[in-house]
């Protein structure tokens, strides 16, 4: 019955002269998401895309629900510009939609069609009412709306509206380097970055043998979930054990976390340059832990000259957890394997670290050599999406 999927996008249509670039990127991402399914035509019109269906509606919709830039989708039945054919198609859509009340809402961009929109509403409403059992018309609070669009090439009839993730197509705003731990926050930050059009490279700091291989596998699994929204994702694993040992042996305990984060940012700056990523993303939320106070963030930021994006900076933990559950990262994040950020944490870390004292403490470290050693031993992985979303 359904011949195509009507895909709507919102913010993209406001992009003026740049709109074709955004639309082309969206279509490319849609084709990537549908790879492996039968080939199909996609037809772009203003503010929407029609995707051809081959009796595979649910599979197509499930994949496109992970494509940023899509606001919503509707399976569409088509009919020629003949009233009787439109009536029959509308009845089929009505019977396929659950509920006991309905209303018809017609649009008529094709002004050559002999009936006006109100007349189409009346004709179809009367027909549906007499050809369906147990149905009532309710123009104020119907269980479903039967939408009818009368266009030059034919009529499109639909009722079901499937939500999309919204946002911008991945890749239109550049690349960002995501600092990803095994926790709840950073994968959500990555998701939010992708929603604003960023393509991601992920950087994970691994402290073997203090953190196990299972900790690393957890991060790979988190990246696999994120890759379901973007396509294959590059994961850079940085060995961090020697740096943490040096900090523990040579620096005041109250500054462990601050100096550790500054070392991470130095390494991230170098990796970002190699990845051509002009921004760093973190999962920090203001005031959540000692390293996430304004003063700590300011001191940590001093070692990089790139923007540090913190998509979750004003979020409550409950809000972060809600999104983590929805996107499929929460159950992975709570696996009981420590990451390097939970190791060597002092009982009383400084929440307002003075920059001068932190810099003085770092003079006890061979900062350049430690960073260089880490960069020489990076492991680079390509993480594919989960099997059930490709």
From Swiss-Prot:
ATP binds at residues 179-180, 204-205, 261, 283, 292. GO terms for cellular component: cytosol. It holds the Pfam family ThiI. It is found in: Cytoplasm. Transmembrane segments: none annotated. GO terms for biological process: thiamine biosynthetic process; thiamine diphosphate biosynthetic process; thiazole biosynthetic process; tRNA 4-thiouridine biosynthesis. GO terms for molecular function: ATP binding; CCA tRNA nucleotidyltransferase activity; tRNA binding; tRNA-uracil-4 sulfurtransferase activity. Pathway: Cofactor biosynthesis; thiamine diphosphate biosynthesis. It comes from the Bacteria. Gene3D superfamilies: 3.30.2130.30, HUPs (3.40.50.620). InterPro entries: Rossmann-like_a/b/a_fold, ThiI_AANH, ThiI_fer, ThiI_N, THUMP_dom, THUMP_ThiI, tRNA_STrfase, tRNA_sulfurtransferase_ThiI. Keywords: ATP-binding, Cytoplasm, Nucleotide-binding, RNA-binding, Thiamine biosynthesis, Transferase, tRNA-binding. Its main location: cytoplasm. Residues 58-161 form the THUMP domain. It catalyses: [ThiI sulfur-carrier protein]-S-sulfanyl-L-cysteine + a uridine in tRNA + 2 reduced [2Fe-2S]-[ferredoxin] + ATP + H(+) = [ThiI sulfur-carrier protein]-L-cysteine + a 4-thiouridine in tRNA + 2 oxidized [2Fe-2S]-[ferredoxin] + AMP + diphosphate; [ThiS sulfur-carrier protein]-C-terminal Gly-Gly-AMP + S-sulfanyl-L-cysteinyl-[cysteine desulfurase] + AH2 = [ThiS sulfur-carrier protein]-C-terminal-Gly-aminoethanethioate + L-cysteinyl-[cysteine desulfurase] + A + AMP + 2 H(+). It is an enzyme of class 2 (transferase). Its EC number is 2.8.1.4. Belongs to the ThiI family. Catalyzes the ATP-dependent transfer of a sulfur to tRNA to produce 4-thiouridine in position 8 of tRNAs, which functions as a near-UV photosensor. Also catalyzes the transfer of sulfur to the sulfur carrier protein ThiS, forming ThiS-thiocarboxylate. This is a step in the synthesis of thiazole, in the thiamine biosynthesis pathway. The sulfur is donated as persulfide by IscS. This is Probable tRNA sulfurtransferase. It comes from Moorella thermoacetica (strain ATCC 39073 / JCM 9320). The lineage of its organism: Bacteria, Bacillati, Bacillota, Clostridia, Moorellales.
